[in-house]
C-alpha cells in the first residue's frame, strides 16, 4: 500500500496524528513513550505542505510515520500480553493473601481459645478476689505516674475473658459506724489532701468524705531497705508517701520510684486483691495509711446518711404521702444539690417555676407582695428539712411568693418537673393505684433466707447424691473451681452442668454470704431466661450446684470468634437479657454481673443468664453497698460506694450493647483502676466508633449509662418498657421472642447431649484444694 492510498487516515490535515494517537511506541526524537510521542504531533502552522507532521522540534513526512504503524501495533500487542501476564500474577497474589488471611483468622481464634483456657487456669493462682495476672508492667495502682493507657488488640477486639471482683459484704447498715481519728499537723493534713486531689480516683470523692479520709489515716514508718508491700501478698491498705523515697519492682525488674505526695494501693481499698508489685523503702520513709474497712465505712456512711435524710424529708411532703418507698427512693437519687449565697432570690413571686426544693442546710425567708402594700410582707422563715415549691411538680407554674436565701448561705436539694414526671408519671393517675405500696411491703415482709422450691422438676432430684453424678467433660475453669458436664445415674441422654466451688477459696475471700445468696436466688427463680438450679451438694473441699446445661456455649465465645455482632444479632441478645432482668427486678433482685461471659446459648439459640454469685435481693426502696462486679461493667455509684440498686443493671446493659457491637467494652484500660477512672469521666466523654454501632444504638447506650442512676432509661415510671420503646427496638417482635417463635440469629450446632464442641478445651485439673471444716456451708 502506497502512502497516497491512505490520505484520510494517515496524511491529510494531520489525520495521521489522530490515528496514530490510538497506538503507542516512540520512534525516537519525541521520547516519553507511545502516548508521549503522539501527544506532540501537530501540523506546523507555517508550513504550506499538508503531508508534514511536526513532533516536538522535528518535522516528519506523513508516509514516514505510516511505516511505523505496524511496529507500534506490534509493540502494543507485546505490552498487552505483558499486562495480562502481570494481571494474572497479581490475581494469584490476591487469592493467596486472602487464603493467608483466612489461615491467620483461624490461627488467631485458636490462640484466643488457648489464651482463654490459660488465663482461666491461671485464676486458680491469682488473687483472692479473682483478679487476673497483670498483663503489662504496672504497680497495682501503686502510683499514678506508673499507670499506663489501655493496650487493645489491633482490631479493637478484646480477646481475654473479663474477671469479676468483689469486696467482702459489709454490715455497716446494721451497726453504728465508729471511726477513729488520728492527730496530724496542719501541714500533714494539707499534704494528704493535695495527694488525694491529684489522684484521678480519690478526687471524685465528696468533700466530706475526703475530710474524713484525712482524719482517719494513721502513721506508719519504714527504714531503708524494708519492704512496705510485697508482690503476691493480699492487699487491703492505701498509702500516701509523706517523706522519703521508695522503689517499685515486679519479679525483680525495677518499674519506678515514688516520693512524697504519691498515693499507692488505691485498688486494695475497693475490694480483695493481691499486690502485683513490690515496694521497698530506699530511705527511711513516713507513710499515712488507710484500711479498706475504714474507707468503706466512710463512703458508705455518708451515702446512707444522705439518702436516709432525703427519704425522711420527702416522706413529709403532703403530695408524696401515698408514694411507695421505692419511688421516693428514686426521687432522692435524682435530686441535685445547689448552693445560694445570702440575699439570693431562689424563687421570685410571679415567675414560672418547675422545681421543688428541700433545705439541706441554712435558712430561707419567705416574702409575699400583697396588693396595696409597697413592700413585700415577710411570711415566715424556713429551716433545714423544710421544703417549698412542691406545687410546681403538679404543673401549677406561677410562684406565689419570694424565697430568699439567708446569710451566710443555704444549701438546697432540687427536683425538677421533668425528672419527677419520668420517675413518677402523672401524679393524679398515680393516686388511682396505691396498691404498689402494699404489694412492695408484702415483698419486704417475706423472709429473705428460706429457699422456695418453685418447680416440680426439682422434686425428681431430691434423692440424688454426689455419688450418682458422673463427670463427662469440662465446660469451664476459674479461681473459684470448675464447671463440669455431668450425667446422673449413668444416663447420658440427659446431661447437666455441675459447678464446683472451692470452700477454702470462698472462705479466704469472705464470699460465704454471696454463695448462699446465689443458691437461694436461683432456687427461687423459674423462668426460661435464667439457667435453672436443680440441686446443691457439699463435701470437705467443695460446694456444688447441679445446673441446667446450655450446650450452645457462652455468648462471649461466639462474640470472640465472630469479632462483633450486627444490629439484628445484638438486638436479639439484648432483648433476651432484658427479659431476664425484668424478671429479676420484679422480684427486687439486682443481678450485678451482666456480661457476655455470663450469657449462655441453649440448643435453641435463645439466651439464658447464669452465675448469680453477686445477685442480691433488696428491700423496697433500699440500696446495697458491697463493691462487686466486673471492672469494665461496674457503674459509677458502685465505684464511689454511694449505694446501688437495680439501676446498676441498666448501666451494665448499656455496656453490654457496646461490647456486642464493638467486640469490646467501651471502658477498658490496662488495669482496673484506670478503667474506673474512665468510667467516672462518663459515657459522654467516650468516642464510640460509628462504623459498627449506629446513632440509634449509641443514643440508647447513652440513656442507659447516665451518671445519675435515677436518670437511666428503665429507672423511670415506665420501667423496662421505656427501654423496649426506644427507637433501636422499633419493629422488634417481642411477642415472638417470648413465645420462642422468633428465629434466633445464630443456631448452635449440638449433635448430642454430651457434645461440648461449643466450649473451649480445658486440661485436667490436678490441683486438689485443702479441706475446709469451718462449717459455714451447713445447710447448703
Swiss-Prot record:
Broadest EC class assigned to this enzyme: transferase
Q: Where in the cell does this protein reside?
A: Cytoplasm; Nucleus
Against PROSITE patterns, the record matches this protein to: AGC_KINASE_CTER (PS51285), CNMP_BINDING_1 (PS00888), CNMP_BINDING_2 (PS00889), CNMP_BINDING_3 (PS50042), PROTEIN_KINASE_ATP (PS00107), PROTEIN_KINASE_DOM (PS50011), PROTEIN_KINASE_ST (PS00108)
Domain of life the protein comes from: Eukaryota
List residues of the Protein kinase domain. Answer: 469-729
Summary of activators and inhibitors of this protein: Binding of cGMP results in enzyme activation.
Give the compositionally biased regions (Gly residues). Answer: 9-35
Q: Which stretches are annotated as coiled coil?
A: 61-127
Q: Which reaction does it catalyse?
A: L-seryl-[protein] + ATP = O-phospho-L-seryl-[protein] + ADP + H(+); L-threonyl-[protein] + ATP = O-phospho-L-threonyl-[protein] + ADP + H(+)
Disruption effect?
Increased size and extended lifespan. Defects in chemosensory behavior, egg-laying, synaptic transmission, and dauer formation. Impaired movement of adult animals in response to sensory stimuli. Loss of adaptive behavior to long lasting exposure to attractive odorants. Normal initial chemotaxis response during a first and short exposure to attractive odorants. Loss of chemotaxis response to the repellent odor 2-nonanone. Defective chemotaxis in response to diacetyl and isoamylalcohol. High sensitivity to benzaldehyde, which is retained following pre-exposure in contrast to wild-type animals.
* Span list, region Disordered: 1-55, 119-143, 757-780
Cofactor requirement = Mg(2+)
> Which residues of this UniProt protein bind 3',5'-cyclic GMP 1?
265-268, 275-276
Q: Which UniProt keywords apply?
A: ATP-binding, cGMP, cGMP-binding, Chemotaxis, Coiled coil, Cytoplasm, Developmental protein, Kinase, Magnesium, Metal-binding, Nucleotide-binding, Nucleus, Repeat, Serine/threonine-protein kinase, Transferase
Tell me what the record says results from residue 276 to A.
Loss of nuclear translocation mediated by cGMP. Loss of nuclear translocation upon prolonged exposure to attractive odorants
Query: Which Gene Ontology cellular component terms are annotated?
Result: cytoplasm; cytosol; nucleus
| Classification via Pfam families | cNMP_binding, Pkinase
**One GO biological process term:** positive regulation of egg-laying behavior
Concerning CDD domains, the annotation shows: CAP_ED, STKc_cGK
Name the organs or tissues of expression: Expressed in AWC sensory neurons (at protein level). Mainly expressed in head neurons, hypodermis, intestine and body wall muscles. L2 and L3 larvae show extensive expression, lower levels are observed in L4 larvae, later embryos and adults. Isoform c is expressed in a subset of neurons in the head, nerve ring, and ventral nerve cord including some motor neurons, also in several neurons in the tail, the pharyngeal marginal cells, body muscle, intestine, vulval muscles, and spermatheca.
Binding positions (ATP): 475-483, 499
Give the UniProt family note.
Belongs to the protein kinase superfamily. AGC Ser/Thr protein kinase family. cGMP subfamily.
Q: What does this protein do?
A: Promotes chemoreceptor gene expression in response to increased cGMP levels by antagonizing the gene repression functions of the class II HDAC hda-4 and the mef-2 transcription factor. Regulates gene expression via recruitment of a histone deacetylase complex containing hda-2, saeg-1 and saeg-2. Represses body size and lifespan through the dbl-1 and insulin pathways, respectively. May also signal through daf-3 and/or daf-5. Role in egg-laying, dauer formation and motility. Regulates behavioral responses to various chemosensory stimuli in sensory neurons.
Record protein name field: cGMP-dependent protein kinase egl-4
